[in-house]
Amino acid sequence: MEPISHLVKSSLPNYLSSLPIPDSIGGWFKLSFKDWLALIPPTVVVAGLGYTAYLAYCPAAQGSCSAKKSGRCNNLIRKNEPKVVDMIDVEDIAEKAAFCRCWKTKNWPYCDGSHGEHNKQTGDNVGPIVIKK
């Protein structure tokens, strides 16, 4: 706890008081190159904190960093049908069958492992539903 106390009570105030912040608008034009370089780190920190707060609290910003989400699960399989329904008779299943739940498979309705790449890209944990006889 003592290092944090020293940082907050001594180091940070000393650093901030040593920054070359002018008293007037005209003073900004009189800053040297070295003074401008000294102002870069706190400016980057303030901008980063502001941007992080913007992303966290502004709903419009949350979709701008990642792909726009349409809310759809199925972006590929039988789009011409109003509802995708597959009926599979349990007697037709030999020992077990894996069915897709991620809508990424090329072998619909069976799972071909496409969810693995989807999980790596998005951090998701979707997998197939496995039916055993």
Curated annotation (Swiss-Prot):
Cofactor binding comment, as recorded: Binds 1 [2Fe-2S] cluster.
The organism's place on the tree of life at top rank: Eukaryota
GO cellular component terms attached to this protein's record: endoplasmic reticulum membrane; mitochondrial outer membrane
Cofactor: [2Fe-2S] cluster
A Pfam family hit: MitoNEET_N
Residues that, per the record, bind [2Fe-2S] cluster: C100, C102, C111, H115
Molecular function via GO: 2 iron, 2 sulfur cluster binding; metal ion binding
Keywords: 2Fe-2S, Endoplasmic reticulum, Iron, Iron-sulfur, Membrane, Metal-binding, Transmembrane, Transmembrane helix
Cell location: Endoplasmic reticulum membrane
Record-linked Gene3D superfamilies: CDGSH iron-sulfur domain, mitoNEET-type
Ranges per topology, Lumenal: 1-35
Side of membrane Cytoplasmic, spans: 59-133
GO biological-process terms attached to the record: intracellular iron ion homeostasis; mitochondrial transport; regulation of autophagy
Membrane topology note: Single-pass membrane protein
UniProt xrefs under SMART domains: ZnF_CDGSH (SM00704)
TM regions (residue ranges): 36-58
Family named by the database record: Belongs to the CISD protein family. CISD2 subfamily.
Protein name according to UniProt: CDGSH iron-sulfur domain-containing protein 2 homolog
Phylogenetic placement of the source organism: Eukaryota, Metazoa, Ecdysozoa, Arthropoda, Hexapoda
